[in-house]
Design a protein with these regions (language model features):
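Hydrophobic ligand-binding cavity/cleft-lining segments
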Residues: 1-89
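A conserved amphipathic terminal alpha-helix motif
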Residues: 2-5, 156-195
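A structural signal for short, well-ordered beta-strand segments
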Residues: 36-38, 139, 151-153
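Short, intrinsically disordered, mixed-charge
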Residues: 50-61, 101, 128, 144, ...
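General beta-strand recognition
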Residues: 83, 122, 147-150
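Hydrophobic-ligand binding "helix-grip"
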Residues: 89-143
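Short, solvent-exposed aromatic-acidic interface loops
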Residues: 125-129, 152-159
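Compact beta-sheet-dominated globular domain cores
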Residues: 141-145, 154-156
Length: 195
């Protein structure tokens, strides 16, 4: 494996938490941890869950949040390398990652999502990313048929420069998270595309 494709942290896989595994606790020590959950109102929870999951897996959650996504794959699958970019105009910070895990929605025989599941993906940072760590993006269809968008992360600055800029980095992360939530709501509201 080339140096540019090696993960920048050792504690991999903590974002891979299938339903009903708790998102509280169990995170690696020494990292700043974020766990955000946002209810998504949906007249048809199954359709909204499927649409949100497919949007997450096809990078559309990120694009809808205003990030550029460069990947040789149209879908998040383990091993896929992706570079997200955020910023204004030509001033963009590139953030290379590799997908660690992904989970598609589980459907019944009628093509409806079965309640009590979590789907999405998690990726880890590669050299050149401003932080070291991992982030997970999930759609959850609870056992009582509610749709929830979840974003988790554990990270630390990748260099002294980013450590000094950590207050700005945290503000940027909060802003991007708010954009993810808006994007998740739009994806869920759009319903699933053709299968």
């Amino acid at each position: 494996m080339e140096a540019m494709d090696r993960f920048t942290y050792d504690e991999r896989g903590a974002t891979d938490r299938p339903f009903p595994e708790s998102l509280d606790g169990g995170w690696p020590n020494g990292y700043t941890v974020m766990v955000e959950t946002h209810a998504i109102e949906a007249a048809d929870p199954s359709a909204a869950f499927i649409a949100l999951t497919e949007g997450i897996l096809a990078w559309n959650l990120h694009r809808g949040a205003g990030l550029t996504m460069e990947s040789d794959a149209g879908r998040a699958e383990p091993g896929v390398r992706v570079v997200s970019g955020f910023g204004l105009g030509r001033v963009r910070i590139k953030a290379p990652c590799r997908v660690l895990w992904s989970r598609s929605p589980q459907l019944d025989g009628a093509g409806r999502a079965e309640p009590g599941q979590r789907a999405g993906f998690g990726y880890g940072t590669l050299p050149g990313h401003p932080v070291r760590g991992e982030e997970g993006f999930y759609a959850e269809l609870t056992a009582d048929n509610r749709v929830v968008f979840i974003c988790t992360a554990y990270s630390m600055p990748a260099s002294l420069l980013y450590r000094l800029a950590s207050p700005v980095t945290r503000l940027t992360q909060r802003y991007v998270l708010s954009r993810y939530v808006l994007s998740a709501r739009a994806l869920a509201a759009a319903g699933p595309g053709p299968r």
